[in-house]
UniProtKB/Swiss-Prot annotation:
Name of the coding gene: aroA
Protein name according to UniProt: 3-phosphoshikimate 1-carboxyvinyltransferase
EC number(s) recorded for this UniProt protein: 2.5.1.19
Binding sites annotated in the UniProt record for phosphoenolpyruvate: K21, G91, R119, Q166, R344, R386
Enzyme class name: transferase
Gene3D superfamilies (UniProt xref): Enolpyruvate transferase domain
């Protein structure tokens, strides 16, 4: 895919960007904890979340889909399927399903694409094995394909060494099948969509006052079925916010955006850098929803070291903002970036250098010198959708060719369409 330099300003109101991926995954998987029909409007129709629907279908769920409206009727009992459960490129789907299936009677095989099958799963499989789960795979169940032989699980008191919503949710799902009350704690608050959704479903969980600890009781009855409208994904919206900031005389309004406090840290960083950006809450139901207004802005360099778990998906796009800011910027305490869909630290630095930007790898992040003269280049996405989309936005300023852009479809299938509607010229 080739993005050409955009010569005109962007002025738009965007109402139909991609639905939130985290909530879409959880809606599908959590429906298996109910016994009645679950409904979602604005379900994300991307490869990752469609794979999750196929997984729960193979476990016995019945699914009706009309456009982005999805109905799920869970099975009375989870089936032990005669096929591999394909998670595609989604670490969320795989890690949550490991936790869900560990305590379910049956035999299950989880696999994914070549990128997912090289991402670490021991952070889930190890604590589950310690409470009685039987999980088999390469490198001591660290790499998929993974085979799970469901067992009755023992109660646990688990303290996670990393701040990860995927680890937290996997442990919550396993706790529902344990033989007694379980507790989970983390060093800092990760995304809390699971807690929000499960509380709305009347799940037997209790969150501590500081939000860092959970008490989870075994399920004694099915949870309340869901009927929700899924808001738009702030991680997807971030690319167009960045576009409005870096393109002269531009303004964008994005509506129906998820504004959960654990999802807007990157927006707050842009504000600290000088971005003319406003977030307005319009709805507070099981999640906080609102709109974002942003316009062309001059950015200043910044050091980012806190709340990294809240901006891990936006980090590649933030690196683009760093490259266009005045002065030096840095991101640290972000070692988790090395085990995402790609090694995002190495890949961002490599590709920024190709575009004429001074950038340096750190063990747990990167340093970027802003204000360098940009040059058109061909970059490698390494199959990482967030790398591809971040450099597509930079391409609006200098022209960029991306070797593999098909990966964008895993999370944001209409990204190219929206970019084209904003005036971008794209050879695809």
């Amino acid at each position: 895919m080739k993005i050409y330099k955009l010569q005109t300003p962007v002025n738009a109101i965007l109402e139909n960007i991609a639905a939130d991926k985290s909530i879409s995954h959880r809606f599908a998987i959590f429906s298996l904890l109910t016994q009645e029909e679950n409904k979602a409007q604005n379900y994300l129709l991307a490869q990752d979340t469609l794979n999750t629907l196929e997984i729960i279908k193979n476990l016995g769920a019945k699914i009706e889909q009309k456009d982005s409206c999805v109905k799920i009727i869970p099975p009375k009992e989870i089936l032990s399927p005669n096929c591999i459960l394909d998670c595609g490129n989604s670490g969320t789907a795989m890690r949550l399903m490991i936790g869900f299936l560990a305590g379910i009677s049956g035999f299950f095989v989880l696999s994914g694409d070549k990128y997912l099958n090289n991402r670490p799963m021991r952070r889930i499989s190890k604590p589950l094995t310690q409470i009685g789960a039987r999980i088999y795979g390469r490198n001591e169940a660290n790499l998929a394909p993974l085979c799970i032989e469901g067992q009755k699980l023992k109660a646990f008191n688990f303290k996670s060494e990393i701040s990860s919503a995927q680890v937290k949710t996997a442990m919550i799902l396993s706790a529902f099948r344990a033989d007694n009350v379980c507790t989970f704690s983390e060093i800092s608050l990760s995304r809390n969509h699971s807690e929000n959704m499960l509380k709305a479903m009347k799940a037997p969980i209790r969150v501590s006052n500081d939000d860092l600890s959970l008490e989870i009781n075994p399920l004694k009855k099915p949870l309340k079925a869901q009927n929700i409208i899924i808001p738009n994904d702030p991680s997807s919206a971030f690319y167009f916010v960045l576009a409005a900031i870096i393109l002269p005389k531009s303004q964008i309004i994005l509506k129906n955006i998820l504004l959960n406090p654990t999802r807007i840290e990157a927006y707050k960083i842009l504000q600290k850098m000088g971005a003319k950006l406003e977030m307005t809450i319009t709805q507070n139901d099981f999640e906080t929803i609102g709109e974002i207004r942003v316009e062309s802005s001059k950015l200043n360099g910044i050091e980012v070291k806190d709340n990294i778990a809240w901006l891990i998906d936006e980090a590649p796009a933030l690196a683009i903002a760093f490259a266009l800011a005045k002065g030096k910027s840095s991101l640290i305490n972000a070692k988790e970036l090395r085990v995402k869909e790609s090694d995002r630290i190495a890949v961002m630095v490599e590709n920024l250098k190709l575009c004429g930007v001074e950038a340096r790898e750190l063990d747990d992040g990167f340093e970027i010198e802003g204000g360098c003269e940009l040059k058109s280049s061909k970059i490698k996405s390494y199959g990482d959708h967030r790398i591809a989309m971040s450099f597509a936005i930079l391409g609006l300023l200098c022209g960029i060719e991306i070797d593999d852009s098909d990966c964008i479809k895993t999370s944001f299938p209409n990204f190219i369409e929206i970019l084209s509607n904003l005036g971008a010229r794209i050879d695809y």
